[in-house]
């Protein structure tokens, strides 16, 4: 069978000639495989009539259509579908008591959707997206497996779940106050002091959440999950913003929690995953289109198959190439000319002082800045980039430096196109194709009033 995915943000029926419908072979034969309900509405693709020729994805000027062939047996195990011609999830992982069960896969495969289902926030619709999800149907569907009792317990309130979201940068938007105040509100277990000590949050308790670093927000989110004293702990990406020592510390605490609870973890750090997980469910598919959760494997076997790109038991190739690690790193054989140099400088930011020794950067080189959190790595890079000023810092010669910030701001008021134009301005024609700039992004002309970029 074939599934059709329509990216509603990319589809612009007012700006195209309906190439997907015009060139579709079944449509030319009188079969309404692709239909436009109205003059300005997006198309509806009937998957049961699709022959999988692949013409519409190639003809769509915006790349808004994906036609994917999948085995027929997968369609019998669909767990959740967001809507017509939208992402769908196949199969579910099996929970284990007193163990850490991990999900491993690329982005956009449905791992977060799976965690939302396991937490009870999302009730699976089994592909019937037009009807209201029914918890009784979920229990009946899994009545002969461990999942049946699992869903019965969380729906009846016999077992409490708590989900640590991956979007820790959104915490300042939904929570107000200091880190201590937020932790106190979640302190159902009465173990506030213990959690603060375990997560090394003692020096951050008085800090307002709006000024907290990414690492502090991550530990705040994890600490809040610990304090709610749930029976089932679901942690979606626990290591982002944390240095290696903090990652190891968090992993140890989660292993301790798993002795008394059911723990699910989504993690991309393979070293931490290998250490913390008792079993791993691999998730494969196509980003934004569909995801398939396979049966659990040992952590070492799952990681090796993920890196190789081939699932042996399932006989499925999830990637056309393997990910290999060379024993020896890349070594340059010739010396490159110096690009930029800086002197010894000191910068004071409140109670924090950074002292930097003189150094230089050569052309065609990749320089790593290694150290624990809150030691001034970001401040050092900001000084070099000219984002932060240090009175005695001399960086010369002054070259154009592109700075990608550690924290991504989503407070920009305007469209993606307007943000891009505000950033690159007159250079937009050398960066993007003429068709995109004049026909898609700015059909009515470039904006006259510029917003500030990120």
What kind of region is each of these model predictions?
Residues 17-39, 44, 55-72:
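Iron-sulfur cluster-binding cysteine motifs and their immediate structural context
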Residues 79-84, 89-90, 129-214, 228, ...:
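ABC-family P-loop ATPase nucleotide-binding domains
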Residues 104-109, 370-372:
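The feature captures the beta-strand-to-loop junction immediately N-terminal to the Walker
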Residues 114, 222, 250, 454:
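Hydrophobic anchor residue at the start of the ABC signature
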Residues 208, 237-238, 245:
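Walker B catalytic motif
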Residues 247-259:
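Helical segment within the ABC ATPase nucleotide-binding domain
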Residues 266-268:
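H-loop/switch region of ABC-family ATPase nucleotide-binding domains
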Residues 282-319:
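Conserved beta-strand-loop-alpha-helix hinge in the C-terminal portion
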């Amino acid at each position: 069978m074939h599934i059709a995915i329509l990216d509603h943000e990319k589809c612009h029926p007012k700006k195209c000639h309906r190439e997907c419908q015009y060139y579709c072979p079944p449509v030319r034969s009188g079969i309404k495989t692709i239909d436009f309900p109205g003059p300005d509405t997006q198309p509806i693709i009937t998957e049961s009539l699709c022959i999988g020729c692949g013409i519409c994805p190639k003809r769509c000027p915006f790349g808004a259509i994906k036609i994917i062939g999948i085995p027929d047996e997968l369609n019998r195990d669909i767990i959740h579908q967001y809507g017509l011609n939208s992402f769908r999830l196949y199969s579910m992982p099996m929970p284990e008591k007193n163990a850490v069960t991990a999900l491993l896969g690329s982005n956009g495969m449905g791992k977060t959707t799976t965690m939302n289902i396991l937490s009870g926030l999302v009730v699976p619709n089994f592909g019937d997206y037009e009807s209201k999800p029914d918890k009784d149907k979920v229990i009946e569907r899994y009545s002969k497996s461990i999942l049946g009792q699992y869903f019965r317990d969380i729906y009846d309130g016999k077992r409490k779940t708590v989900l640590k979201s991956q979007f820790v940068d959104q915490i300042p938007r939904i929570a107000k106050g200091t880190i201590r105040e937020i932790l106190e509100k979640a302190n159902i277990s009465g173990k506030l002091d213990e959690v603060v000590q375990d997560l090394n949050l003692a020096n951050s308790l008085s800090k307002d959440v709006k000024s907290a670093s990414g690492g502090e927000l991550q530990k705040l989110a994890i600490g809040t999950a610990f304090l709610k004293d749930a029976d089932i702990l679901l942690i979606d990406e626990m290591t982002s913003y944390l240095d290696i020592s903090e990652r190891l510390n968090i992993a140890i605490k989660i292993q301790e929690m798993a002795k008394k609870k059911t723990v699910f973890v989504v993690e991309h750090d393979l070293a931490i995953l290998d250490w913390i997980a008792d079993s791993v469910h691999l998730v494969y598919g196509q980003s934004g289109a569909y995801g398939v959760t396979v049966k659990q494997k040992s952590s070492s076997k799952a990681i090796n198959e993920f890196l190789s790109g081939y699932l042996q038991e399932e006989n499925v190739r999830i990637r056309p190439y393997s990910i290999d690690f060379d024993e020896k790193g890349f070594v340059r054989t010739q010396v490159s000319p110096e690009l930029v140099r800086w002197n010894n400088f000191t910068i004071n930011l409140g109670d924090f002082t950074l002292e930097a020794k003189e150094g230089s950067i050569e052309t065609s080189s990749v320089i790593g800045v290694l150290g624990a959190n809150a030691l001034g790595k970001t401040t050092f890079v900001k000084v070099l980039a000219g984002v932060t000023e240090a009175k005695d810092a001399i960086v010369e010669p002054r070259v154009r430096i592109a700075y990608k910030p550690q924290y991504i701001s989503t407070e920009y008021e305007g469209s993606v196109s307007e943000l891009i134009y505000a950033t690159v301005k007159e250079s937009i024609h050398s960066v993007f194709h003429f068709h995109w700039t004049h026909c898609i992004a700015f059909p009515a002309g470039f904006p006259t009033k510029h917003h500030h970029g990120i």
